[in-house]
Amino acid sequence: YADLELPETMARKMNFLRAGITLPAPADSAAAARLSELTTRMGSSYSSGLMEIDGEMVDHNELENIMRTSRDPEFLAHVWDGWRRAYDPEQMSTDYAEMVEIANQGARDLGFDNLAQMWLSNYDMPADEMEAEVERLWGQVEPLYQQLHCHVRANLNELYGDEIQAAEGPIRADLLGNMWAQSWASLSDVASVSESGPAYNLDDLLVDAGYDQHQMVETAESFFTSLGMEPLPDTFWERSLITQPRDRQVACHASAWNMDYEDDLRIKMCTRVNGDDFVTVHHELGHNFYQRAYNEQDVLFQTGAHDGFHEAIGDFIALSVTPEYLVQIGLLDEADMPDESADLSLLMDTALDKIAFLPFAVMMDQWRWQVLRGEITPEEYNEQWWALRESYQGIVPPTDR
């Protein structure tokens, strides 16, 4: 249909139908079954990896919390490396390479050169223009990121000394408060700005107010109902995974689900009572309320306007968790409302989360696009991954990779 002159709405529907699949299965049924088998095995391996610490088997969710809160560099390096060895990395690499081969065939069956081109076609512009636009936008933000990187590196050097973190060059990935160094939000104590006045600690506010995980989600729901939106359905509370199950391992990465395109909305998240997760809950419910908003659309339009729109909605809501909002919901006493002298601290907290994430996101897609185009071979996966991480993020692993 690409060469047909279709009405704009019909052409958009056809593009959603053709390119709206993350991993397209080939027409061959055996290959399609194999693709499903591979993705299931990799997902299960990723979510069920355990690491022994002090005689106890610790899961990924707890390891994430350790990375967030510990300031012991030897222990951080041990946890960082141990989690990456908790599943079979060689098998994961082999499975991933086979998945790439099969999914690329599925993309070719749909008329694309490869899966990278298919993914890049979902942003209302030609694939090559989208890739160039990503680099253009990153070029605008990169100088600010470099300044943030320099500031955080200097503070880490002051905290740990030259032997752990050099005053110049890349930052050790395990010191950045996150298993993937994709958000540095938990480093607010390390990256504090001396010129700034007193702010607040959202972790402490939640604990002092006696919040539990469900109350965090209820508060996020109230954000939306205060705007005139209908409350979430009872099934949301019955069917969502809000806390980590005790009887099984699950993938704890936060996600929002639209199960029936009517009103069966859910989240899946191993929520902890801390500021990061409080913001994330608002982000995830942003997805849910957006999903509900388009459930009345034609079936092929029951999705995000394009592949970037859902995350824009989620983060727009997350950025609304401001001091003024915390006062409105009673978490922050109005007398403790930070004045203008605290603006630097609040802006730094935002930068540690949002600005620090951007080179990770660009690097991740650059690696995937190059893998899918065959520019990075399976034998080069790890080497090129870390080359891109150092180039974009300015980070290096704490152990040999």
For every predicted segment, state its role:
Residues 207-212, 262-282:
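Short pre-active-site segment immediately N-terminal to the catalytic Zn-binding motif
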Residues 266-268, 298-305, 343-352:
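Short beta-alpha connecting loops at secondary-structure transitions
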Residues 272-294, 311-319, 367:
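Active-site recognition of the HExxH zinc-binding catalytic motif
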Residues 133-152, 206-233:
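Zn2+-dependent metallopeptidase catalytic core
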Residues 66-67, 222, 242-264:
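Catalytic zinc-binding patch centered on the HExxH motif and its immediate surroundings
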Residues 1-204, 398-399:
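A well-structured
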Residues 323-401:
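Long, amphipathic alpha-helical stalk/connector segments used for oligomerization, subunit docking
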Residues 134-144, 304-342:
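Post-HExxH zinc-binding segment in Zn-dependent metallohydrolases
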